[in-house]
């Protein structure tokens, strides 16, 4: 969890009383060093978007770890501590279809979009998804092998 330098999740909550400045952020730092940001916006009334930004990417890999950051990004969509059936199965069961991740040179970004805020349990569960993505992946060898093949195919298609 030490490699987690920054947690950025932007929640777009719809409230009955509109805020005057929708671009203001609330932010803070937890005891474990995690920084969070919350921003209200009226763009999607009744829905929230969640982001996890980790300041880790391919830059942190040693030569013998080439592509590992990308593999770990893919592994976030397999079993996690709280979602043994996989995060996508949980999200889709609740009608949430927009979620993804990207690994760059110096960061990895995960997101879950358009989450209904009417259910506080679902809101809490999406925060739990971010928590699991931050360091509670179940790294099963067979899943890692499968994702390595997927990544090879992604690279082949880009060329």
Segments (PLM) and residue ranges:
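Generic marker of residues within folded, mature protein domains
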Residues: 8, 42, 100-102
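Active-site-adjacent, His/Asp/Glu-enriched structural segments that form or flank metal-binding
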Residues: 56-69, 74-159
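Short, solvent-exposed loop/turn segments at the edges of secondary structure
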Residues: 4, 31, 45-47, 94, ...
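Mature N-terminal segment immediately following signal peptide/propeptide cleavage
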Residues: 19-51
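Bacterial Sec-dependent N-terminal signal peptides
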Residues: 1-22
